[in-house]
Amino acid sequence: MKMVSTYTVPAELSHLSAIRHFVTQVVNGYCTDEDFLYDLTLAVDEAVTNIIVHGYYLKPGEKLASGNGTITILIEPFADRMEVILRDHAPQFNPTLNPEPDFSQPIEKRKPGGMGIFLVRELTDRMEYKPLPAGGNELRLVKLFPHP
């Protein structure tokens, strides 16, 4: 039987270290490949940072009035992959529709933003978005286990 590990934290940057620790502890129980662990942990860190900074804050330091300000992380192992589901109550936003940054432009001429989502895409094998019926978001990150 698969075990789903769940962790709910306040949507605050000060909890990123605890989130990384949670992901590391759970994933290490199923896959000890260092690159796999690093990639998945960094992808979760980037996605959660985006949720906190862009979803729950109007501008730096100013939280949204609505929503309960939490993020729930569910990690579910499968035979060939690990899936991480991030649920929040921030305004709905589909990151899978976000265009990739324009790398043909010098960095000083690029439109700001989008690097975190790009990094999450690059570090995972699949990223899926679903708006939650009662409001909020669900982002599923899928990472295939390395071949032996």
Question: Model-flagged regions — what are they?
Answer:
Residues 13, 17, 46, 97, ...:
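Solvent-exposed, flexible loop/coil residues
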Residues 23-45, 109-111:
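Conserved short strand/loop->alpha-helix "switch" segment adjacent to the catalytic nucleotide/phosphoryl-transfer site
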Residues 1-6, 52-148:
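Conserved beta-strand-loop-beta-strand hairpin that lines the nucleotide-binding pocket
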Residues 47, 51:
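Hydrophobic residues in the alpha-helical elements that line and stabilize the ATP-binding pocket
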Residues 2-34:
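Helix-loop-beta hinge of the Bergerat
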